[in-house]
Amino acid sequence: MSTDKTDVKMGVLRIYLDGAYGIGKTTAAEEFLHHFAITPNRILLIGEPLSYWRNLAGEDAICGIYGTQTRRLNGDVSPEDAQRLTAHFQSLFCSPHAIMHAKISALMDTSTSDLVQVNKEPYKIMLSDRHPIASTICFPLSRYLVGDMSPAALPGLLFTLPAEPPGTNLVVCTVSLPSHLSRVSKRARPGETVNLPFVMVLRNVYIMLINTIIFLKTNNWHAGWNTLSFCNDVFKQKLQKSECIKLREVPGIEDTLFAVLKLPELCGEFGNILPLWAWGMETLSNCLRSMSPFVLSLEQTPQHAAQELKTLLPQMTPANMSSGAWNILKELVNAVQDNTS
């Protein structure tokens, strides 16, 4: 494998398509790739590490996490043991994404000066099907909110995130609830089940994620922390039953993930977050603050979504990468995908 990273500096757009499962992200990403296929070596698509999830040291994370909920409902496992098993299987989703993300980060030119302009073509595009925060933030929080995981599992996932390199463009994909339920029921991945409360919570959490990133551009997490009520069962039920979180141009802290993270288990007797978890909250905030957030509707055809994504490109934050590093990245991605085919 080549190790030359000193070639010509290039402008690169790192784009991460994310959102709830089963809405058509992968199809939209493939359509976007097809759109740019006329320009060789222009775009690199990084797919979900599905086969790693299917066989991680002999364990199937997808069947395991959904199967655990079925076993709990059938009374085959206690609620407490089900929460522990869910936390275990959720952790299996994290490692393939995290390792790949670390390799990508190491290849980036993190200097903030002299950014290569990407408003003049050609420039490179790295399009990833999900960002690691899907498995470390959004899905674990959603599992907790429906009772599938205990709060004890959250700090190790949410508060230990690595620093995010410059130029992360996070595109949260959305569809209407009827379209979502129709699509996820049709794709029928082995072991995957449709749980309406979980789907509803996940949709709310992704809107909270966007609100959180916007909020952190001008605020700190502790601004308004004391005004938040503890995340209680009433709030959890509301998140499970309706799309109660709205996308805000100017979010308040109550519109963000911090409204979920105000947990008695993380706080002292007066509601102040314990020092260790406060440091973790800073780590989480720094990671999210550095991202550029976008929203993309997948309600219409994949072709329409690809065109809409293209219109967002001029608004995105570029990064630098050498041509040698780009070639290394292609080799890495091809090696992983060859091993997962």
From Swiss-Prot:
Q: Sorted alphabetically, which Gene3D superfamilies does this protein's record hold?
A: P-loop containing nucleotide triphosphate hydrolases
UniProt keyword terms in alphabetical order: ATP-binding, DNA synthesis, Early protein, Kinase, Nucleotide-binding, Transferase
One Gene Ontology term from the biological process aspect of the record = DNA biosynthetic process
Which GO terms fall under molecular function for this chain's record?
Answer: ATP binding; thymidine kinase activity
Matching entries from InterPro entries are given as:
Herpes_TK, P-loop_NTPase
**Mind telling me which Pfam families this protein's record contains?**
Herpes_TK
Which sites bind substrate?
66, 90, 189
Q: Where does ATP bind?
A: 19-26, 183
Q: Which reaction does it catalyse?
A: thymidine + ATP = dTMP + ADP + H(+)
> What are the positions of the active site?
48 (proton acceptor)
Protein origin, superkingdom: Viruses
EC number(s)? 2.7.1.21
Q: Which HAMAP family match?
A: HSV_KITH
Describe its partners and assembly state: Homodimer.
What family is this protein classified in?
Answer: Belongs to the herpesviridae thymidine kinase family.
Task performed by this protein: Catalyzes the transfer of the gamma-phospho group of ATP to thymidine to generate dTMP in the salvage pathway of pyrimidine synthesis. The dTMP serves as a substrate for DNA polymerase during viral DNA replication. Allows the virus to be reactivated and to grow in non-proliferative cells lacking a high concentration of phosphorylated nucleic acid precursors.
> Any other noteworthy remark?
Phosphorylates and thereby activates certain drugs like acyclovir (ACV), valacyclovir, and famciclovir to a toxic form, that leads to successful suppression of the infection, while the uninfected cell does not have this ability because it lacks TK. Mutations in thymidine kinase may induce HSV resistance to antiviral therapies in immunocompromised patients. The most frequently observed resistant strains are unable to express TK and are avirulent in animal models of disease.
Protein name per its UniProtKB record: Thymidine kinase
